[in-house]
Amino acid sequence: MNLKNKKAICIMSGGMDSTLGAYMVKEMGYEIVALHFNYAQRTEAKELFCFKKICEALNVSNSYVLDLDFFSKIGASALTDKSIDIPINGLEEGVPITYVPFRNGIFLSIAAALAEKEEAVLIAIGVVQEDSSGYPDCKDSFITSMEQSINLGTKDETKIKIYMPLVHLSKSQIVEHALRLNVPLELTWSCYKDEEAACGVCDSCRLRLNGFRLANAKDPIEYM
């Protein structure tokens, strides 16, 4: 395929996974349209700051920041409801309280609308199934079904592929890939709790730190 002038919508949280995904898309030759969501998450300001810095590093000229504050009205997640404590005692069985109901389904639906507007042929999302916190909307089967639904519910001439390059990687493999591509991991943020220094004890911090440990690499961000 000739990728000249081919656009990809990259859903970017400011985290390590979605940032690596964007760098992989750039390496493939796509023009990146960066998409970030403020969804009333605890670390909203830090994630937005990181997103903007990463866009600068990628030389992205076309970006969107969309506010989805209705997530706080839905609640039911420790990420969007501050009355619910962020778990700090390690990963547990089942779906954790940090799961935001159907977040990725909503993100992908909005990304599809933007893809139609921008005439993009790819949506990139940094979901990780194997080494994640057990979120149901990070499954390969779910993302594949969303791709089918998006193509059924858009114009006939719209053909969108959802790219999920990390879905079957472990966190250590993600770190290794990111280091090979010179991804600026110092600009990324994973912590669920804090915005100054990462807490080091929430599920997301634990997964990130373990990934660096297994990859025999040093995490460049600051921890408490």
UniProtKB/Swiss-Prot annotation:
<feature type="binding site">
    <location>
        <position position="205"/>
    </location>
    <ligand>
        <name>Zn(2+)</name>
    </ligand>
</feature>
<protein>
    <recommendedName>
        <fullName>7-cyano-7-deazaguanine synthase</fullName>
        <ecNumber>6.3.4.20</ecNumber>
    </recommendedName>
</protein>
<keyword id="KW-0479">Metal-binding</keyword>
<dbReference type="GO" id="GO:0005524">
    <property type="term" value="F:ATP binding"/>
</dbReference>
<keyword id="KW-0067">ATP-binding</keyword>
<comment type="pathway">
    <text>Purine metabolism; 7-cyano-7-deazaguanine biosynthesis.</text>
</comment>
<dbReference type="InterPro" id="IPR018317">
    <property type="entry name" value="QueC"/>
</dbReference>
<feature type="binding site">
    <location>
        <position position="191"/>
    </location>
    <ligand>
        <name>Zn(2+)</name>
    </ligand>
</feature>
<feature type="binding site">
    <location>
        <begin position="12"/>
        <end position="22"/>
    </location>
    <ligand>
        <name>ATP</name>
    </ligand>
</feature>
<dbReference type="InterPro" id="IPR014729">
    <property type="entry name" value="Rossmann-like_a/b/a_fold"/>
</dbReference>
<keyword id="KW-0671">Queuosine biosynthesis</keyword>
<keyword id="KW-0862">Zinc</keyword>
<dbReference type="GO" id="GO:0016879">
    <property type="term" value="F:ligase activity, forming carbon-nitrogen bonds"/>
</dbReference>
<dbReference type="Pfam" id="PF06508">
    <property type="entry name" value="QueC"/>
</dbReference>
<keyword id="KW-0436">Ligase</keyword>
<dbReference type="GO" id="GO:0008270">
    <property type="term" value="F:zinc ion binding"/>
</dbReference>
<comment type="function">
    <text>Catalyzes the ATP-dependent conversion of 7-carboxy-7-deazaguanine (CDG) to 7-cyano-7-deazaguanine (preQ(0)).</text>
</comment>
<feature type="binding site">
    <location>
        <position position="199"/>
    </location>
    <ligand>
        <name>Zn(2+)</name>
    </ligand>
</feature>
<feature type="binding site">
    <location>
        <position position="202"/>
    </location>
    <ligand>
        <name>Zn(2+)</name>
    </ligand>
</feature>
<comment type="similarity">
    <text>Belongs to the QueC family.</text>
</comment>
<keyword id="KW-0547">Nucleotide-binding</keyword>
<dbReference type="GO" id="GO:0008616">
    <property type="term" value="P:queuosine biosynthetic process"/>
</dbReference>
